[in-house]
Amino acid sequence: MKIAYSPCPNDTFVFHAWAHGLIQGAPELDVTYADIDITNGWAAKGEGPEVMKISYAALPYVLDQYALIPCGGALGRGCGPLVLTAGGGAVRLSDADGSKDDNARLSEASGVTGLPTAGSAHAHSGASAPGMDPGWLSGRTVAVPSDRSTAYLLFRLWAAQQIPGGLPNIVVLPFHEIMPAVRDGKVDAGLVIHEARFTYPDYGLTLMADMGTWWEADTGLPIPLGAIIARRGMDVEALTRWTQASVEYAWANPAASAEYVQKYAQEMSPEVARFHIGLYVNEFTRSLGEDGLRAVESLLGRAASEGLVPKFDPALLRA
């Protein structure tokens, strides 16, 4: 069976067992590793592997051709995209919203240390940057990982509230190129995802806004990010069962996937990869459940009502 997912640690962790023939009864996987902007495009054209990881924001465009697999994706709390600017110092998440820094919280939970926290030399609680006022973005250039990414959809909803002067100019870059582009002055700000939550201080960047914090405060719901989809007509029940088995194997045998995860994690350190997995692989990955589905319906329904995505039949999310 052909499948496409990203080389990010959460995806390789989730699918390691299945991709390595460790799930009884599951078909052999032919894996393509692709950035989510690529899989979003494939799904929109009805091309690519029959099973793919795409952005939830891309789902309304393809629900007539693809079914949502209610597991294996990325949805949670405290894991939203960030808007970053270049500035004199990095304002950690804790400085911006008064909560404990993600790295400190996850360090306490996992016992892993060494990542920058709010009190480290990477942090600068008094830092300011020209972009700390969201209105500063009006008319400027912001790099995003995909114009059909959930990160960008959240940004559009946030910007409609926070940027009265109108939306900035948008350019699409692979997510690993966004922070260097902001640092080097090629763009004014960047919308980042994944491990950038942990590593942006190393680029001398400043946090302007956390889309997840905004979404959770506005709705009380978790943040839908990435979805697993399959061509309609495939056995969704079996795909769900095999994916859940792969997730459960990964949790029960975390060391088994370490080499595979690190192979595709590019230059990410093992510690950052572990934090990445800890943040993005959670109970919603094992099963969306009713809370997860409500979050998806809320995000996409709101976006559709504002003309940001096509209108769709919510029943198709469950069929």
Segments from the language model and where they lie:
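Beta->alpha turn/N-cap motifs
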Residues: 35-37, 43-60, 64-65, 174-175, ...
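Pocket-lining segment of extracytoplasmic ligand-binding domains
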Residues: 173-263
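A short beta-strand-loop structural module common to alpha/beta enzyme folds
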Residues: 24-38
